[in-house]
């Protein structure tokens, strides 16, 4: 039992900085929304529209690069640190290629916004301007993620946290300068948020690069000392590992976007209540998501050491800690749901609906924690294809259709409105949790030689 407590302490030591880094990232989005809203409601709406298109695209690239963390962790655990720098260099090449693709897609997404039915021309113009300013930050963001994944693969999660808060501190004054046009800069309104955020991503990358080059613990890993061109064999392997993660993230983000679109015709009260419950649930999700990143590092490191038993201890401890956290957040949600809803809105109907939906959110928090930590475990085992198939099946084959039937039709029960979609979330996330755990057990029951062979690829 002692080994599980020791492992839990190590997991939390890795996870807490990741949690704080996620808080900083979320706060940056909050600052953009508030400061754009302070300029005008149209500019705030433009930032919201642009962000809704930016997030799926950039998270696709983010997911692709997550393959680097278990690769670095496994090489570190096996003592083959001399092979880390070449892998990271190829990570930068991959980030560069993906950045170009994302920038092209986002530039052309502007035409989609302009052609939206009944959209205000000024709103469309500002949203397109915001997106086309922000897209220049895509390379900086993805290069930062490569450096961050290198650090996290080496069990150094604090640098990502520090750079996240540096980005937040830089974002506020730079937003102010470009939104309102100070120090000789043009007054850009909401578009200035895009300029500021793009600039901040490059600052975060430069800061992280400076830290990596000066860190004593990484003096033997010098990615910038010699140039190497693209190694397509390594790039292909990273894509094979990362693409299922990227697609899983993309499908998860688009699922919630589709549900938001399906809820929107139900009326202002339903939309507001749904959005409040979803926003709070997203904040709670940061805890298991950060723990999942820590579990990936620990499982990858243990497999690199050649110990499948210790990898199992890391995996089981991660699930146990995740369930404990989820029980705590679920109880907190149930007890404080009305007070939480009042922080967002004081309309009695909105508060009542949001409080009701938060009860459903509390139910799925345990399943959500298990499935996201299960995903982190499978990443550590480099079994990423199953993550995609499980996520797609749970969300799009089970969760969304069942939510649609419950929310908008009378086929099963009288139409439930937004609560039906939340029941669909429960079905989808619970299915994902069960399938993740079954897959984990299947992997762990394989002979050690097969597990270690897969991890060493």
UniProtKB/Swiss-Prot annotation:
GO terms for molecular function: antiporter activity; xenobiotic transmembrane transporter activity. One of its GO terms (biological process) is sodium ion transport. It holds the Pfam family MatE. The keyword Transmembrane applies. It is a multi-pass membrane protein. Keywords: Antiport, Cell inner membrane, Cell membrane, Ion transport, Membrane, Sodium, Sodium transport, Transmembrane, Transmembrane helix, Transport. Signal peptide: none annotated. This is Multidrug resistance protein MdtK. It comes from Klebsiella pneumoniae subsp. pneumoniae (strain ATCC 700721 / MGH 78578). The lineage of its organism: Bacteria, Pseudomonadati, Pseudomonadota, Gammaproteobacteria, Enterobacterales.
């Amino acid at each position: 039992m002692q080994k599980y407590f020791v492992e839990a302490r190590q997991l939390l030591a890795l996870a807490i900085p990741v949690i704080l880094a996620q808080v900083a990232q979320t706060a940056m989005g909050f600052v953009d929304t508030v400061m754009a809203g302070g300029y005008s409601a149209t500019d705030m709406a433009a930032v919201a529209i642009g962000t809704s298109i930016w997030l799926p695209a950039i998270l696709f690239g983010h997911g692709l690069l997550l393959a680097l963390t278990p690769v670095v962790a496994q090489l570190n655990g096996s003592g083959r640190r001399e092979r880390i720098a070449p892998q990271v260099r190829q990570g930068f090449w991959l980030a560069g290629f993906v950045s170009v693709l994302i920038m092209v897609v986002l530039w052309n997404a502007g035409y989609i916004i302009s052609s939206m039915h009944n959209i205000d021309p000024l709103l469309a113009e500002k949203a397109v301007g915001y997106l086309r300013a922000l897209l220049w930050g895509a390379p900086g963001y993805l290069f930062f993620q490569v450096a961050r994944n290198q650090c996290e693969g080496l069990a150094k999660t604090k640098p990502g946290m520090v750079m996240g808060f540096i980005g937040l501190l830089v974002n506020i004054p730079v937003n102010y300068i470009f939104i309102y046009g100070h120090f000789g800069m043009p007054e850009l309104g909401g578009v200035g948020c895009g300029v500021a955020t793009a600039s901040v991503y490059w600052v975060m990358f430069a800061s992280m690069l400076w830290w990596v080059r000066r860190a004593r613990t990484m003096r033997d890993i010098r990615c910038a000392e010699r140039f190497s061109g693209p190694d397509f064999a390594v790039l292909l392997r990273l894509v094979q590992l990362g693409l299922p993660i990227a697609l899983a993230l993309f499908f998860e983000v688009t699922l919630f976007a589709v549900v938001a679109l399906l809820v929107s015709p139900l009326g202002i009260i339903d939309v507001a209540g749904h959005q409040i419950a979803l926003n709070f649930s997203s904040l709670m999700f940061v805890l298991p998501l950060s723990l999942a990143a820590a579990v990936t590092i620990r499982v990858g490191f243990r497999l690199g050491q050649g110990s499948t038993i210790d990898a199992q201890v890391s995996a089981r401890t991660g699930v146990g800690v995740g369930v404990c956290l989820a029980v705590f957040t679920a109880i907190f949600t149930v007890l404080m749901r009305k007070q939480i809803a009042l922080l967002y809105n004081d309309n009695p109907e909105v508060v009542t609906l949001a409080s009701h939906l938060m009860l459903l959110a509390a139910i799925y928090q345990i399943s959500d924690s298990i499935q996201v930590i299960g995903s982190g475990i499978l990443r550590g085992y480099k079994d990423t294809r199953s993550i995609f198939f499980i996520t797609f099946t749970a969300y799009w084959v089970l969760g969304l259709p069942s939510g649609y039937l419950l929310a908008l039709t009378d086929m099963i029960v009288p139409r439930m409105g937004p609560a039906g979609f939340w029941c669909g979330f429960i079905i989808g996330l619970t299915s994902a949790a069960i399938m993740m755990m079954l897959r984990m057990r299947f992997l762990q029951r394989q002979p050690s030689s097969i597990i270690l062979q897969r991890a060493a690829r």
